[in-house]
Amino acid sequence: MMQTKFIIQMTLETRPDLEYFYCGEGKSGAQVFELKKSRAKKYDTMEEVNRDAFILQAVHKASGETYTVLPIRCRT
């Protein structure tokens, strides 16, 4: 979990353009995945962010990697 917190902090510092992302802790370590607003629309609620994070989590699970998902809204 410390690795995840470190990666979240680094993402906040190095990617100020990211409004939404989720951090996954999987078998191969922690990783940050961008939730691309441009793909569909701007998110209005955290429920929409969580839904997309859940969909992406399912995609990674299909590839054999399992992530514990922490959705984060880092900008207001």
Language-model segments: residues:
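Short, mixed-charge low-complexity intrinsically disordered segments
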Residues: 39-76
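Short aromatic-glycine-(Arg/Gly/Cys) micro-motifs in beta-strand/loop hairpins
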Residues: 2-39
